[in-house]
């Protein structure tokens, strides 16, 4: 929709209802507008959009079906997995999903540990936000993971790459940097 909101309301109450009925857990990402927002909010379907307008869709042409599309500064390809939260939308190429999940689990458990350590005054924000943690921090985190019930499902996460980077191994550091936005 190229950010069209007025006369660009691709999704409304009817299409949201159809998405819910046909897919159960599907949703929509629209780089444009929606309408019938009150009806949409009553349906348990996630729809990400740029704005709300009461006008119907007009002066739009479908250029491709099941092909690549540009949404903002991102490109979504057929088969990509869509991850959407209140913070934004990610398009994950299907061949990278396992790797992304692994890194997301690591980030999540590091957040649980990091927030706890900040609250206790054990580490500073600079230490928690560092790309490479010290060996002592990583070992303390591994102990924390084993003891804290919030981390139960992360007990088997492999931290060897992070430990190698903490010990100054250049290959590990280079590999670790691939997972950090610069």
Where are these predicted regions, by residue range?
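Feature captures the catalytic cores and cofactor-binding loops of soluble hydro-lyases/lyases
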Residues: 1-78, 91-182
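Generic structural signal for buried aliphatic residues
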Residues: 82-83
């Amino acid at each position: 929709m190229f950010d069209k909101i007025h006369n660009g309301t691709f999704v409304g109450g009817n299409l949201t209802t159809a998405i819910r009925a046909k897919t159960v857990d599907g949703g929509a990402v629209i780089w444009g507008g929606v309408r019938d927002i009150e009806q949409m909010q009553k349906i348990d379907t996630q729809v990400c959009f740029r704005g709300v307008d009461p006008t119907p869709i007009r002066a739009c042409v479908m250029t491709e079906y099941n092909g690549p599309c540009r949404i903002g500064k991102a490109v979504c390809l057929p088969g990509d997995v869509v991850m959407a939260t209140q913070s934004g939308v990610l398009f994950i190429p299907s061949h990278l999903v396992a790797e992304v999940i692994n890194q997301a689990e690591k980030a999540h458990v590091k957040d649980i540990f990091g927030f706890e350590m900040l609250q206790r005054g054990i580490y500073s924000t600079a230490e928690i936000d560092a790309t490479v943690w010290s060996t002592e921090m990583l070992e303390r985190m591994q102990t924390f993971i084993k003891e804290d019930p919030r981390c139960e499902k992360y007990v088997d996460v492999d931290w060897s790459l992070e430990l190698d980077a903490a010990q100054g191994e250049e290959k590990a550091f280079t590999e670790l940097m691939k997972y950090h936005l610069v």
